[in-house]
């Protein structure tokens, strides 16, 4: 990430998963932008991938998202899952959402081709509530968050296959977020080669919406 100032690296199990422009932004977002590496076992990753592949294969990659936020993608909303996958999604709900939060009944599945990427954007409150939680499959990637008013304040998340990321509150509404394209995919000085990436995204209910109400697909990561 370009820019001056001190770069701070938070480490977990002797490896860095979150890095930022300084201690203040890391402190501010320590509970609002969370990475849990190794959340899925290899078998669980394969369970989700096998279930999603037939449905995704029927769709073509697109290059013009409705709000121009995503390039090289295909996506779907999925509400019917095998029991094995439902068990995984229940673990996501327990890990990321509070007891008072209701989830949207459909799960957003986003498939980025190797050269696909998500441009910086801020989520709309029309499409999902205060929390989103995403499982990363197939390829590592780097998510970058930048403060909308103070671009010198930024955070980067290393999302490896099998990891869970959680964005809440300020991380979603005060910061833009993006998935870096392959040629920009670095975590500090470490190159993170991009391949095809699937994210499985659970979302809390927007305020005032019933859990079964349909909505336009959000530009979620």
Curated annotation (Swiss-Prot):
Main location: mitochondrion
Protein name per its UniProtKB record: Alpha-ketoglutarate-dependent dioxygenase alkB homolog 7, mitochondrial
Functional description taken from the UniProt entry: May function as protein hydroxylase; can catalyze auto-hydroxylation at Leu-110 (in vitro), but this activity may be due to the absence of the true substrate. Required to induce programmed necrosis in response to DNA damage caused by cytotoxic alkylating agents. Acts by triggering the collapse of mitochondrial membrane potential and loss of mitochondrial function that leads to energy depletion and cell death. ALKBH7-mediated necrosis is probably required to prevent the accumulation of cells with DNA damage. Does not display DNA demethylase activity. Involved in fatty acid metabolism.
Residue ranges of coiled coil: none
Single GO cellular component term: mitochondrial matrix
Gene3D superfamilies listed in its UniProt record: Alpha-ketoglutarate-dependent dioxygenase AlkB-like
GO biological process: DNA damage response; fatty acid metabolic process; regulation of lipid storage; regulation of mitochondrial membrane permeability involved in programmed necrotic cell death
Family stated for the protein in its record: Belongs to the alkB family.
Transit peptide as recorded in UniProt: 1-23
Residue sites binding Fe cation per the record: 121, 123, 177
Keywords from the named record: Dioxygenase, Iron, Metal-binding, Mitochondrion, Necrosis, Oxidoreductase, Transit peptide
Gene that encodes it: ALKBH7
Reported cofactor(s): Fe(2+)
Residues at which 2-oxoglutarate binds: 165, 197-199, 203
Cofactor: record remark: Binds 1 Fe(2+) ion per subunit.
GO molecular function, one term: metal ion binding
Subcellular location: Mitochondrion matrix
Enzyme Commission identifier(s): 1.14.11.-
